[in-house]
C-alpha cells in the first residue's frame, strides 16, 4: 500500500479482501467486487486456487478476462493447477516456495535456539509471468481517477 501511495494512488480499502486461499473465497470476493458501482479493472489474487474462483465469478458476470478485467495470481509453480491451463492463460508471479520454506525453517530454528536477529518480515523478489489474462485497462469514463 505504501508503494501505491508513493506513486500517487489511493487504495480503496473496500477492494482489499483477506480470506482463506480457496476457490470458493475467490468466487465470493470477486462477486462482491463486481457488484460495486465502480468495479475494478484488474485484480490480484493471492494464489492460483483463489483465482480459479475469481475466474468463475468473472465468467458468470459475462466479462472477458484480459479485455474487460485483468487477473493476476501468485503461485506460478503449483503442479496440480497450472496457470497456462486456465481457459484464459493466467498471468502470475513466481517465487521459490522451496527457498521460502528453507528461510522460514532457518528463522524458526534460529528463534528457538536464540541465534540471530531476524526481522518480522522480509520482502522477496517475484518474477512476473505475463499471459493472456492481463491487458490494457478498459476505457471506462468512471475509472478516470487515481483510486485503485
Identify the meaning behind each predicted range.
Residues 1-148:
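Bacterial carbohydrate/catabolite-sensing allosteric modules
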Amino acid at each position: 500500500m505504501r508503494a501505491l501511495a508513493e506513486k500517487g494512488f489511493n487504495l480503496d480499502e473496500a477492494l482489499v479482501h483477506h480470506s482463506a486461499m480457496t476457490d470458493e473465497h475467490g468466487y465470493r470476493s470477486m462477486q462482491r467486487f463486481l457488484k460495486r458501482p465502480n468495479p475494478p479493472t484488474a485484480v490480484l489474487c493471492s494464489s492460483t486456487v483463489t483465482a480459479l474462483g475469481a475466474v468463475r465469478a468473472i465468467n458468470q458476470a459475462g466479462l472477458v478476462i484480459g479485455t474487460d478485467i485483468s487477473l493476476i495470481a501468485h503461485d506460478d509453480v503449483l503442479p496440480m493447477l497450472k496457470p497456462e491451463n486456465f481457459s484464459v492463460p493466467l498471468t502470475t508471479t513466481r517465487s521459490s516456495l522451496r527457498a521460502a520454506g528453507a528461510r522460514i525453517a532457518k528463522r524458526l530454528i534460529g528463534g528457538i535456539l536464540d541465534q540471530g536477529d531476524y526481522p518480522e518480515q522480509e520482502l522477496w523478489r517475484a518474477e512476473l509471468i505475463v499471459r493472456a489474462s492481463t491487458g490494457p485497462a478498459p476505457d471506462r469514463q468512471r475509472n478516470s481517477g487515481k483510486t485503485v
